[in-house]
Amino acid sequence: METVSRSSFQPHPGLQKTLEQFHLSSMSSLGGPAAFSARWAQEMYKKDNGKDPAEPVLHLPPIQPPPVMPGPFFMPSDRSTERCETILEGETISCFVVGGEKRLCLPQILNSVLRDFSLQQINSVCDELHIYCSRCTADQLEILKVMGILPFSAPSCGLITKTDAERLCNALLYGGTYPPHCKKEFSSTIELELTEKSFKVYHECFGKCKGLLVPELYSNPSAACIQCLDCRLMYPPHKFVVHSHKSLENRTCHWGFDSANWRSYILLSQDYTGKEEKARLGQLLDEMKEKFDYNNKYKRKAPRNRESPRVQLRRTKMFKTMLWDPAGGSAVLQRQPDGNEVPSDPPASKKTKIDDSASQSPASTEKEKQSSWLRSLSSSSNKSIGCVHPRQRLSAFRPWSPAVSANEKELSTHLPALIRDSSFYSYKSFENAVAPNVALAPPAQQKVVSNPPCATVVSRSSEPPSSAAQPRKRKHAAETPAVPEPVATVTAPEEDKESEAEIEVETREEFTSSLSSLSSPSFTSSSSAKDMSSPGMQAPVPVNSSYEVAAHSDSHSSGLEAELEHLRQALDSGLDTKEAKEKFLHEVVKMRVKQEEKLNAALQAKRSLHQELEFLRVAKKEKLREATEAKRNLRKEIERLRAENEKKMKEANESRIRLKRELEQARQIRVCDKGCEAGRLRAKYSAQIEDLQVKLQHAEADREQLRADLMHEREAREHLEKVVKELQEQLWPKSSSQSSSENTTSNMEN
């Protein structure tokens, strides 16, 4: 972009505003402002420049369209159902390893570690820390139910990663990830004294925190030996790595954190710049990390200028039989006087001096047997791996340096090109059954011809032995009756990631068909004749009459040892006639076919065992599912029977209480009747008698009253009769008086 001089450059207000917006957006997001805002600022800037020619012209290049991004790389989700256990705040929690990350059972955490906190508090902290909890699959839920971790009525279960569980527990149990700073006036009084053995450390987990480590205080795994330089509080190492005061993260995806791996997270402070001081403090830190490391998870870094003994031994075993022969492109083996087979010497230009002194240790002797190019390879790999840029330092969430992977990719250029097919495998894969095939790729201009593994023991070097004490070299490959295979070696694609054992199995199966064609006498005779007529053939060695005896003397041995012994005796005796060579070739082919038959039988047995194991696994899974279903049904039936039993027991208790109450009432009534029946009857009868007496008295009184009334009426009648008689006597005569008196008397009687 072309601009005017810096002193006279004045950015346009629109451009300045865009830059400010970009600066603010880039601090809180991964992208920045949208593309149209920058394009709008550019167009407005051009328009303003066209209107005002006095301002300096700033030519902005046209914005290139964004490159087409490749499609997403789809991978099947990891639905692991292998249950394991982990320790969280002293509690054992069940978990599943999904994608390399432990996912813990959330209900188990809530009921054990966080049982003193409410769901509202936990949800608020999860929102603050941007913690997301996933749901377990049906298989995982079934396993948790079968193991008794969840009840069978649980519809689902949440899973939380080990990293988020550490953050959540630290925020709730220890006052949050970002505790407040202590007052500065008290910081000087509680600050630890800086001694020769104490030094500053830091970590970059969930933000950055610096502390002062005092190794003397690290007396047990939970001892508080690190003081935070901000709050001056003491923490044990596994709590210090989750302690922080600065929110340096913005929606960071945390993965793979485990406070038990604090030895990888705590680093030496960058304030120490002196080489000697840094080395001394680094050694103290390593010694402190090695204390109480019962699982031996922490391993001290090896110096960059040399390899550890374990790495040297592993490299020695890996390249023990793999050396490059520029003449024929195949690996060669030699038999030492002690009976051990070792690779032959490399070319003279790369040959190293070998000290055969008996005073050397076995490790040094084995190290001297390595070729010069192998040593240069190891040294170059050490340099490439050990050379790490200071800016690419290890961190809690950046434990690998980009330089390591890049140098490891360049490591293959130092090695001879290996044949990327099934003819190369580890010498440990079938060391009890077959000979190790360590064939290397020949130069590009030569035709690739694969020989049987039995022919790889023959050296193409024609150098004579230097002394009688040294093992004599094998003859040139052209002298040996090695069977050339007409089929070229099949190279496998580079993306083939199968194991070495499976690769060797495929090669053996393909090689069996070629060996069957080699077993015919016509082919062996023609091939041996071709070998006899080849140029550069040396004078044949006189045949030994003891060849047949030597060829069959080791018939009792089997496998690799018998084959190697047979070849050694045959080559030591020498072959001079065509018949002897053909006979030797027939023996080799017969032995190889027999060995292949044994290998095929072993592979078939292994395949059948694998199938049976898979069948048993499926059957076991099916039985487990059936048992789980039966257990669930049985539990449901037990729950139903328990509910019915409880209901019946409740009804029986209620009826028992009611009957008991009625019985008590009846008993009270019966007791009262027995004690009060006579008195009640007596009182009843007395009352009746009194009533009758009262009634009798009333009747007597009424009778007396009636008698008195009757007496009064009689007296009144008598008086009336007198009065009437007197009146009759006075008024009427005597006759009439008689008749009237009679009538009156009759009326009175009536």
Swiss-Prot record:
Keyword rRNA-binding part of the UniProt annotation: no
Record field: compositional bias (Acidic residues): 493-504
GO annotation terms (biological process): negative regulation of BMP signaling pathway; negative regulation of transcription by RNA polymerase II; negative regulation of transforming growth factor beta receptor signaling pathway
Gene3D superfamilies associated with the record: SAND domain-like, Ski
MF annotations from Gene Ontology: DNA-binding transcription factor activity, RNA polymerase II-specific; DNA-binding transcription factor binding; protein domain specific binding; protein homodimerization activity; RNA polymerase II cis-regulatory region sequence-specific DNA binding; sequence-specific DNA binding; SMAD binding
Keywords: Coiled coil, Nucleus, Proto-oncogene, Repeat
Residue ranges with Polar residues bias: 458-469
Pfam family, one: Ski_Sno_DHD
Annotated localization: Nucleus
Region feature (Disordered): 329-386, 447-542, 727-750
Name this protein carries in UniProt: Ski oncogene
Organism listed in the record: Gallus gallus
